[in-house]
UniProtKB/Swiss-Prot annotation:
Keywords: Endonuclease, Hydrolase, Nuclease, RNA-binding, tRNA processing. GO terms for biological process: tRNA 5'-leader removal. SUPFAM superfamilies: Ribosomal protein S5 domain 2-like. This is Ribonuclease P protein component. It comes from the Bacteria. It comes from Phytoplasma australiense. Its EC number is 3.1.26.5.
């Protein structure tokens, strides 16, 4: 993923959480906010230590980055979003993660066109 698509500044991430807009289930929560000035979307991933060991946390982050990369051409450029991953996501396959992300993304109008 290119650096321009990643939320790095704490102030940007805090602003997304303060917007209090969210959508999720027991596996993960997507916090999002709409920005007026962006030409591309930005995102961040958060996995707590309760999720598991480092290699498990890295695996789920790699999977979600791959899913976001797959949908990147269809994601609304006006959005910043943070995905908080919870321990039940361990039991999901890549395909289940992909369908769950697509469902929530279309629900919050993050996708420009449904795939």
């Amino acid at each position: 993923m290119k650096r321009k698509y990643i939320l790095k500044k704490e102030s940007e991430i805090t602003a997304v959480f303060r917007s209090k807009k969210r959508c999720g289930n027991s596996s993960f929560i997507i916090y999002y906010s709409k920005q007026n000035v962006n030409t591309y979307f930005k995102f961040a991933l958060s996995v707590g230590k309760k999720y598991g060991k480092a290699h498990e946390r890295n695996l789920i982050k790699r999977r979600l980055r791959a899913i976001i990369r797959n949908y990147s051409s269809n994601l609304n450029p006006a959005f910043f979003f943070v995905i908080v991953i919870k321990p039940p996501a361990k039991n999901l396959t890549f395909q289940q993660l992909k369908t769950t992300f697509a469902k929530f993304a279309s629900k919050i109008n993050l996708l420009l066109s449904n795939n």
